């Protein structure tokens, strides 16, 4: 079973410009990582009659109880004017023990 470094994984995830409704591949990326460590994953698409389709990742590990559920999100807000950034968005950077996400 593979192991993952938390900082490396966080940097990989941050590189995806996953601005709703475009997930930029982050769902498939995370599903692959979770599948590699034993999860069964499904990417589900939800659409309200007045909205655009939005993808969600459903991942399950095992079938026994008790069950544990974690809910999070993989989308980000639009970065706005790129010229206003000192560190480019979607470019995770660590400088002198400070992180810029």
Predicted regions, residues:
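Acidic active-site catalytic centers that drive phospho-/nucleotidyl reactions
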Residues: 7-9, 23, 75, 97
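N-terminal glycine-rich anion-binding loops that anchor highly charged ligand groups
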Residues: 4
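Active-site metal-coordination/substrate-binding segment of hydrolases
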Residues: 67-101
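A non-catalytic alpha/beta surface segment that caps or lines the substrate-entry region
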Residues: 19-66, 86-91
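Generic N-terminal amphipathic, Lys/Arg-enriched alpha-helix
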Residues: 7-17
């Amino acid at each position: 079973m593979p192991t993952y470094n938390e900082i490396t994984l966080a940097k990989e995830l941050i590189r995806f410009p996953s601005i709703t409704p475009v997930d930029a591949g982050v769902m498939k990326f995370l599903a692959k990582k979770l599948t590699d460590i034993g999860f069964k994953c499904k990417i589900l698409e939800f659409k309200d009659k007045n909205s655009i389709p939005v993808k969600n990742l459903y991942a399950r590990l095992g079938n026994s109880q008790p069950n544990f559920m974690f809910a999070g999100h993989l989308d980000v807000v639009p970065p706005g004017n790129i010229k206003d950034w000192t560190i480019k968005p979607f470019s995770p950077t660590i400088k002198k023990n400070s992180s810029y996400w």
